[in-house]
Amino acid sequence: MQAQGSLAAAESYAWHRPVLAQHAEQYDPRVRSRIERGAAMSAVDYIHLQHARQAWIARMEARVAGFDALLSPTVAIVPPLLSDVAPGEARDAAFFQANALVLRNTSVVNMLDGCALSLPCHVQGELPVGLMVWHAAGRDDAVLNVGQRIEELLQKQ
């Protein structure tokens, strides 16, 4: 889906373009560079990606229709320490790698136009992690019902 570029970058660039034109220096350089990637996407590529996205959504909805909800980690990794990814050229690669992993699971649900919630499920005193309960668009009630039941079970522990 992202081979020709990112829908998020194109859409964020469309929104931020007037502000960037006047105040680009006020943006975090890492964030600004990701937004500015959207300037390179053509209208043809954007429309192609939107059609591909709609086809992907339809396939996903058909596959998950019989499930109450789907479960996955909210993030793929425990977020790194700030000192490991703090601004600085030497840490940029680590930042972008961690950022991609932290956003990966929720971005998939967003790209699929799904709905989700995240339940904290970490052991007291350990770094926080979340369990994402998700489903296709319009299945909010199912997600909330499953999430409430899981929350009740987690509280018994």
Locate the predicted segments by residue.
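Short, surface-exposed loop/helix-turn segments at secondary-structure junctions
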Residues: Q4, H48, P80-L103
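Short helix-loop capping/hinge segments that flank enzyme active sites or metal/cofactor-binding pockets
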Residues: S6-I57, E61, I77, S118-P128
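Short, hinge-like loop/turn segments at secondary-structure boundaries
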Residues: G5-E11, G88-A90, H135-A136
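Structural helix-boundary/capping segments
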Residues: A40-M41, I47, A58, N110-Q157
